[in-house]
């Protein structure tokens, strides 16, 4: 069992997942530096690099983003149906400079490097992840037995329908879909398809470099991605965000709403539960070990180095 703490401020949101009194996960989002992962843009091919089998894509940001041929969806190459590892069609035969593409960010920019992109779009819902360019039904391995997964897959295939009948598309069932009714799954399917239809409609009406779809905020992703049956409580120290999250959860994650609590204490929520101290210890350059030795961790743009020192360890 675990608890989730949300510390909200106008400039920054921090989320800590606490299990057995220790911080197991820490998530941070700055208002002016929101992550781009999951965002969908209408991009324009700025340059094709055959030697690197990649292309630079202008998505309206300061630096051009990067698209590798392996992340380029095409009807002629499907990695899931490619057991022989047949190489994909060369990128210079698939895209050209000036071409517009609907792309999704899969990795945020770092240092001087632009964002990493994919044209294989995925849209996360409450119980499902929609893969509009695919026809695969995937089931989380965390869901029950093989028999339960097979039953869910059969139900989903019926609900999804056939492309020629207006259905189709690929879906991955998240862990919270295990106990979902057909009505709940059907509602999520309809919501995700509607979202994709709106994205496609915007892509036809907007110029290249336009943001077509933005992923949920960190506070909302707590309910979608972090809250599970193992969550005992979700405490948030902002009344405004508590009310907004409750309204959001009532529609998309009703089972998690009952676990929401507004923290009203005078002490900062992260201080009260010892999170600040754990953060400082985790981010320290030096990490002391029980044996008497210690680690020195340094991060550069290219790599992270870990220097192991014996210190007071004498065997």
Located regions from the model:
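DE-rich acidic low-complexity regions and acidic surface loops
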Residues: 1-315
């Amino acid at each position: 069992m675990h608890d989730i703490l949300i510390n909200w401020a106008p400039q920054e949101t921090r989320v800590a997942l606490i299990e057995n009194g220790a911080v197991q996960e820490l998530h941070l989002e700055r208002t002016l530096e929101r992550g781009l992962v999951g965002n969908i843009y209408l991009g324009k091919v700025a340059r094709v690099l055959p030697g690197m089998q990649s292309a630079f894509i202008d998505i309206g940001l300061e630096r051009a983003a990067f698209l590798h041929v392996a992340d380029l969806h095409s009807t002629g190459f499907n990695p899931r149906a490619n057991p022989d590892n047949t190489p994909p069609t060369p990128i210079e035969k698939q895209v050209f400079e000036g071409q517009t593409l609907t792309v999704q960010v899969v990795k945020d920019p770092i240092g001087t490097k632009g964002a990493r992109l994919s044209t294989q779009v995925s849209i996360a819902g409450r119980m499902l992840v929609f893969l509009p360019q695919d026809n695969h039904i995937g089931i989380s391995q965390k869901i029950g037995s093989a028999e339960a997964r097979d039953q869910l897959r059969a139900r989903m295939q019926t609900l999804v329908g056939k492309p020629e009948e207006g259905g189709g598309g690929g879906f991955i069932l998240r862990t919270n879909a295990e106990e979902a009714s057909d009505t709940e799954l059907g509602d999520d399917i309809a919501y995700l398809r509607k979202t994709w239809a709106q994205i496609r409609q915007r892509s036809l009406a907007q110029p290249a470099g336009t943001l077509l779809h933005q992923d949920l905020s960190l506070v909302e992703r707590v309910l979608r991605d972090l809250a599970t049956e193992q969550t005992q409580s979700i405490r948030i120290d902002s009344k405004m965000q508590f009310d907004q999250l409750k309204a959001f959860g009532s529609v998309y994650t009703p089972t998690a709403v009952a676990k929401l609590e507004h923290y009203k204490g005078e002490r900062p929520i992260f201080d009260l539960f010892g999170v600040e101290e754990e953060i400082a210890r985790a981010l320290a350059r030096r990490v002391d070990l029980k044996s008497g030795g210690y680690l020195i961790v340094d991060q550069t743009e290219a790599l992270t180095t870990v220097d192991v020192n014996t210190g007071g360890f004498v065997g």
